[in-house]
Structures are given as C-alpha cells and as structure tokens.
Amino acid sequence: MDDETLILLAYIRNAPTREKVLKSFKDEDFLRPIQVSKKTGIHPNNVSKKLKDLREHELVYVINPEYAIPRLYRLTEKGKNMLQFL
C-alpha cells in the first residue's frame, strides 16, 4: 500500500460515519443520500455532509450535478479501491 492510500485510509477510519457512508456503496452502482441514510442509520443531514467530504477527497462523485434533488452518487475508482481496505 502506498503512502497516499495509507493516509487516505487513516482519514476515512478516523470518522466512523465517514467509513459507514463509504461502505454503504458496496454492491451498489449508485445511491441517493436518503438511501445511504437508511442503510447506515445516519441522519440525512450528516449523510450529506459526509458525501460532500468524500466528494472533496475524490472518493465519490455526483452523477447528475445539474439536479439538486435527487442527487445520485457513485464511487470513483479511488473510492472503489479504498473499499477493499475497509
């Protein structure tokens, strides 16, 4: 595992909700924030914050940025790679 991956993994694991949100994409092509909330039990407002955070770290991306609701999220290749370590 390279240094960048190790640092990112530590960052993800530092916040249990961040890790739960990322793990919710396992076996899913895409998810809406409300689906992530239902799968994880995390309040929708917190899910939105964590998705924004994961997006800033290039782990997820918005499939349909032109629409505010419902936003559809998908893992990036980097996000898929990180899932194998969680």
Locations of regions flagged by a protein language model:
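A short, conserved structural fragment
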Residues: 55-65
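Short alpha-helical segments that sit at the start of domains
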Residues: 1-20
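Short, Lys/Arg-rich nucleic-acid/phosphate-binding segment
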Residues: 15, 64-72
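Conserved segment of winged-helix/HTH DNA-binding domains
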Residues: 27, 74-86
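Residues within the helices of the helix-turn-helix
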Residues: 23, 33-34, 52
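Short amphipathic alpha-helical interaction segments
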Residues: 42-56
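Short acidic, hydrophobic short linear motifs in intrinsically disordered regions
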Residues: 30-38
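Pre-recognition alpha-helix immediately N-terminal to the DNA-recognition helix
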Residues: 19-23, 81
